[in-house]
């Protein structure tokens, strides 16, 4: 809002949120007193009316084995792609695992496209994280999506199960690569006792790009914010200072 008032942000791009669609879905959030986990299964609480209508049937969701010893504080059930899939998020406290590092050793990161992350230390070491695999996945997704959308439009449909399956697979593959990239960078810092990570960032760097239609498409669709948030989370876990420097 401050940028809108100062004229630095286009006022046409700022609007009030839309109302939820008539048959739209919303996330179900279970707090501590509503979480019931027995025998590695989460039982979703239901109303009496629902239980009568479905003959007492209960929805039970398997809990990952790695969460057995964790104290789960919140569970979020998020509908995806119009309720075709559901994403389950378990929120729990992660015990810190501080490692021996030197605050004088710094790793600078420049995020990009072909070079997903260009990393250099103040001790003279440098390395690149390849981003071409992400571009390839995104290019294939755009090509397939355009074809499936044209078929769906001829049939009077906005989306189809095949489109949702395609998007789900693409998102999983992208997130997997970004997580592994963040893990590699943090492991490098641990091995070299680097105590500070400085990541270049510009809040509005994706707005008004003029790098060509194809490059703009790749750059805006690849979630660099997910990579930054994963890096920040891992740094907090291992006691590494994470900073973002405006470019």
Predicted regions and their residues:
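Acidic carboxylate diad motif detector
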Residues: 1-80, 221
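Positively charged, helix-rich recognition surfaces that bind polyanionic ligands
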Residues: 84-247
């Amino acid at each position: 809002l401050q940028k809108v008032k100062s004229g630095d942000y286009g006022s046409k791009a700022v609007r009030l949120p839309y109302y939820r669609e008539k048959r739209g879905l919303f996330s179900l959030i279970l707090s501590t007193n509503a979480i019931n986990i027995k025998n590695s299964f989460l039982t979703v609480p239901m109303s009496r009316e629902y239980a009568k209508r479905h003959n007492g049937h209960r929805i039970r969701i398997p809990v990952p084995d790695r969460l057995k010893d964790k104290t789960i504080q919140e569970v979020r059930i998020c509908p995806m792609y119009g309720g075709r899939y559901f994403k389950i998020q378990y929120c729990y406290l992660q015990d810190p695992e501080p490692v021996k590092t030197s605050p004088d050793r710094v790793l600078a990161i420049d995020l990009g496209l072909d070079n997903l992350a260009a990393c250099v230390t103040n001790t003279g070491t440098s390395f690149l994280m390849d981003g071409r695999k992400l571009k390839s996945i995104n290019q294939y997704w755009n090509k397939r999506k355009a074809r499936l959308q044209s078929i769906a439009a001829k049939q009077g449909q906005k989306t189809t199960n095949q489109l949702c399956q395609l998007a789900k697979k693409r998102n999983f593959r992208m997130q997997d690569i970004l997580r592994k990239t963040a893990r590699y960078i943090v492991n490098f810092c641990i091995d070299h006792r680097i105590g500070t990570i400085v990541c270049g960032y510009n809040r509005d760097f994706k707005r008004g790009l003029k790098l060509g239609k194809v490059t703009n498409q790749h750059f805006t669709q690849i979630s660099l914010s997910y990579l930054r948030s994963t890096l920040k989370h891992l740094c907090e876990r291992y006691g590494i200072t994470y900073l973002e420097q405006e470019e």
